[in-house]
Amino acid sequence: MAVTKLVLLRHGESEWNRENRFTGWTDVELSEKGRQEALAAGRLLKAQGFSFDIAYTSVLKRAIHTLWHVLDKLDQPWLPVEKSWKLNERHYGALQGLNKAETAQQYGDEQVKLWRRAFAITPPALTPDDPRYPGHDPRYAALSADELPLTESLATTIERVIPYWQQQIAPRISAGERIIIAAHGNSLRALVKHLDHLSEGEIVELNIPTGVPLVYEFDKNMRPLHHYYLGDATEIAARQSAVANQGKAG
């Protein structure tokens, strides 16, 4: 049976991941730990014999720089890269920049978990005059006001991620191209929900760790056969637990 592989990679730890802050569309740098995670992911993919025909990422530098580090370790810095805002992290509205633990102390662990992980619940929205509104950012100048979020749930994130997947990425995988997507926790959760047909309840508990390659294998009809993380299982579980605990008051 012909098998085509896709690699999903959440960016390495960012400075705001390290500070336990809601990030969303805020364009923050990788932390030093995040850079090392990205380099390690590239080395691991190289050791496992992976190479790619094209890469996809968001327009946020923590994902872009993660991809750069990976492609450098794969000796594929020349690889074609498609960048799209549709692969951006979910927009966290007025929560962007706030510390997650402090927000949990104010509103409670359960409310913050719902804001972070529930399927259709949106955080408090920005207003268009807020400096954090993406309409003030030149990289989104070509987008209409209807396309620019004031806040997003996972459900509304899916509304931009899955059409992009279906129109731009899936046909290339179906044609046999080897693809890596370097993106974000929630844009990747949106894609995983679609690929694995997860329920709204199941997606709440899904945590994607930073800097760990997630491999999907598809048959010729683009049906996922199975998926698996590359790396040490104990370390991967620890990173998933760390993601889950970010929104707790402590």
Curated annotation (Swiss-Prot):
Substrate binds at residues 10-17, 23-24, 62, 89-92, 100, 116-117, 185-186. Keywords: Gluconeogenesis, Glycolysis, Isomerase. Its EC number is 5.4.2.11. Pathway: Carbohydrate degradation; glycolysis; pyruvate from D-glyceraldehyde 3-phosphate: step 3/5. PROSITE patterns: PG_MUTASE. The record marks 184 as: Transition state stabilizer. The active site is at 11 (tele-phosphohistidine intermediate), 89 (proton donor/acceptor). It is an enzyme of class 5 (isomerase). GO terms for biological process: gluconeogenesis; glycolytic process. It catalyses: (2R)-2-phosphoglycerate = (2R)-3-phosphoglycerate. SUPFAM superfamilies: Phosphoglycerate mutase-like. Transmembrane segments: none annotated. It comes from the Bacteria. GO terms for molecular function: phosphoglycerate mutase activity. It holds the Pfam family His_Phos_1. Catalyzes the interconversion of 2-phosphoglycerate and 3-phosphoglycerate. Belongs to the phosphoglycerate mutase family. BPG-dependent PGAM subfamily. Homodimer. HAMAP family: PGAM_GpmA. This is 2,3-bisphosphoglycerate-dependent phosphoglycerate mutase.
